[in-house]
Amino acid sequence: MGSSKKHRGEKEAAGTTAAAGTGGTTEQPPRHREHKKHKHRSSGGGSSGGERRKRSRERGAERGSGRRGAEAEARSGAHGRERSQAEPSERRVKREKRDEGYEAAASSKASSGDASSLSIEETNKLRAKLGLKPLEVNAVKKEAGTKEEPVAADVINPMALRQREELREKLAAAKEKRLLNQKLGKIKTLGEDDPWLDDTAAWIERSRQLQKEKDLAEKRAKLLEEMDQEFGVSTLVEEEFEQRRQDLYSARDLQGLTVEHAIDSFREGETVVLTLKDKGVLQEGEDVLVNVNMVDKERADKNVELRKKKPDYLPYAEDESVDDLAQQKPRSILAKYDEELEGERPHSFRLEQGGMADGLRERELEEIRTKLRLQAQSLNTVGPRLASEYLSPEEMVTFKKTKRRVKKIRKKEKEVIMRADDLLPLGEDQTQDGDFGSRLRGRGRRRVPEVEEEALEDEEKDPVAQPPPSDDTRVENMDISDEEDGGALPSGPPELEEDEAELELQKQLEKGRRLRQLQQLQQLRDSGEKVLEIVKKLESRQRGWEEEEDPERKGTIVFNATSEFCRTLGEIPTYGLAGNREEQEELMDFERDEERSANGGSESDGEENIGWSTVNLDEEKQHQDFSASSTTILDEEPIVNRGLAAALLLCQNKGLLETTVQKVARVKAPNKSLPSAVYCIEDKMAIDDKYSRREEYRGFTQDFKEKDGYKPDVKIEYVDETGRKLTPKEAFRQLSHRFHGKGSGKMKTERRMKKLDEEALLKKMSSSDTPLGTVALLQEKQKAQKTPYIVLSGSGKSMNANTITK
């Protein structure tokens, strides 16, 4: 009971000796007292030590076991206390890893008299030498002590832990030093020289060796390259790398993408990361690149500008008209409203080939817009500049020296008349001597009678005239060079006549009129007599002009506003016997105005005759007979399928309708031609009604056999004030209201209008939507929520009901 430290040390020595005698490798450390009430707990350990000593004495019969037990006892007696104090934690780990089942089996064998025993470590070593799988050590942890049998905790020695850490640090430093010495041992120092540097033969030998190695490496590389080419390995490798290179996303894939920033916002040498701009789920459009930081900066700048609230009226403010790229800025009036009316102007540009963009295209477009804006007339005057003695190339292009026009006046030696033969196409022999146009610039022209007689004889010999050339006056306007008519020009200075330009115009007009008259002559070439009459008419007209007209007015035609207005009206044909159809000849001949006004009711075939023409009074009767012979015998009947008015007009022309309007017009008509027309219609009516009025009071005596298969399909439809077709019920209601003079009430009218609106909505409904447009509303909701779906939560009853809570 009152044991001291000496007695406790002897017990521990005895315990360790017994454990060594059993041949076990594990050592049981001494249990230190944890509390005063557990200081006599070691008596149990002494009893267990006695059992171990008994077993050791039984095994001590053998020599080897006895020797091992003595050595273990001596070792434990010498160093037992020191080990227990230095390494308590290590012994605890070994004690926890001990297999209690194996120890029990070993103790049972020892008690049965088997003297040989091996530990698990030794058994595993033997099994490893034999190539067998080592045994597994089942570490069975002892249960923690209970309240009745507590287990003493191990004492932690901080000095031992510190010494262990210092030893580990020393070992690590030694290992690092050893590795460093091994690495530096291969490097030569400055004091050590190679032997081949001082010896020439050694240097030559080394150089030859290096050259041989180099040649051998080149041969090997060449051989490998030939083998690759022979088997196609290099081609396959190149194709593989090329395919990988093409599959990689590179700068060429950026061509055509839009960057939604101004190009001047990117500074040179600055790296900017662009990402795809977010857009709606249902939004379809091209991808746009933006930078998040730049977007935030632009938004912040805009907010700053809005916060400033600058005054709008700045009459003397001068904004910078040039931007950073030395380009002219567009200036607009009331620019503060541009963004509100036109929306925010986007600043963007497109990437070109290779993902590059220099902004050249945007600047060109801006220059074009500026030029278009500056095309308007400006009040800015040109600034002063130094006068130059020479013209610039641009001014030389615009400079054109006016050429003085000298009038060529012929001598009035011989005047010839225009003949039909002059209009014949020239032959090869007549090309040089032919007349290319009028060379005579005189006023009055005297016609030679001999020339006229020759013209008449030629016309009689060849009544069929050749087709004249076109009425293009460009041939007559040609000017022949001075070499051809050098003798015709006067030697002195040319005498310019008054109003020469006007006279020249009149001559050209007269020439065109003659060409048109000869064209009429070609149309009447089938009759020689008619050609002769036209020639005589021309002759008489020319003679009459020579006798009656003034010499100043010869060969001219007088134009005034009235004649031009009447000529441009053209022919306005009017149908009917009392119409005012034009004669075959033109109404614009001033010589026959009075005669035409007297005989305006004569008929004509309405043949188109454009231009100026003159006819003698003696021949007027012949032309009237000619025109009367070409009139149509039957009048034109109006087309019935054009409408009810055309059908009534047809009945009126045939005399089937008896109208009082025509009878009144017959009595009160101021024109003489109207009664004759009415009389003809009345006469026709009498002839047509000769048999119809006789059967008027008789009735039908027989059926219409030709109408046996006729079954009329009558469909009566009524429409309202908006043009909508009414149903039979609605039509009856409308007629009833109109007859009785009353209408529907307010409620009925509103219900009817609501029903009509619903029908109109149903007709206007899209084929892919409901009448109320719920599909469009669904798409708008998805666009607002930025999701491709919509969540329907709860029912209509629960959503509409009012929830009452306490």
Curated annotation (Swiss-Prot):
Segments for region (Disordered): 1-121, 418-505, 578-610
Numbered residues of crosslink Glycyl lysine isopeptide (Lys-Gly) (interchain with G-Cter in SUMO2): 125, 133, 141, 147, 188, 277, 329, 336, 400, 414, 554, 654, 663, 690, 705, 715, 729, 755, 764, 781, 786, 797
Feature: compositional bias, Basic residues: 32-42
Subcellular location(s) of the protein: Nucleus
Biased composition (Acidic residues): 451-461
Modifications after synthesis and translation: Sumoylated with SUMO2.
Keywords: Coiled coil, Isopeptide bond, mRNA processing, mRNA splicing, Nucleus, Phosphoprotein, Spliceosome, Ubl conjugation
Comp. bias intervals (Low complexity): 104-119
Coiled-coil residue spans: 157-231, 495-540
One record GO biological process: maturation of 5S rRNA
InterPro entries: HIND, SNU66/SART1
Cross-link (Glycyl lysine isopeptide (Lys-Gly) (interchain with G-Cter in SUMO1)): K141
Pfam families the UniProt entry points to: HIND (PF19252), SART-1 (PF03343)
A cellular component term, taken from the record's GO annotations: nuclear speck
Record carries keyword Calcium: no
Keyword NADP: no
Phosphothreonine modifications at: T189, T431, T701, T770
Modified residues (Phosphoserine): S321, S348, S481, S527, S597, S602, S604, S627, S767, S795
PANTHER family: SQUAMOUS CELL CARCINOMA ANTIGEN RECOGNISED BY CYTOTOXIC T LYMPHOCYTES, U4_U6.U5 TRI-SNRNP-ASSOCIATED PROTEIN 1
Function: Plays a role in mRNA splicing as a component of the U4/U6-U5 tri-snRNP, one of the building blocks of the spliceosome. May also bind to DNA.
Subunit structure comment from the entry: Identified in the spliceosome C complex. Component of the U4/U6-U5 tri-snRNP complex composed of the U4, U6 and U5 snRNAs and at least PRPF3, PRPF4, PRPF6, PRPF8, PRPF31, SNRNP200, TXNL4A, SNRNP40, DDX23, CD2BP2, PPIH, SNU13, EFTUD2, SART1 and USP39. Interacts with UBL5.
Similarity comment: Belongs to the SNU66/SART1 family.
Name recorded for this polypeptide: U4/U6.U5 tri-snRNP-associated protein 1
Naturally occurring in which organism (per UniProt): Rattus norvegicus
Taxonomic lineage from the root: Eukaryota, Metazoa, Chordata, Craniata, Vertebrata
Annotated gene: Sart1
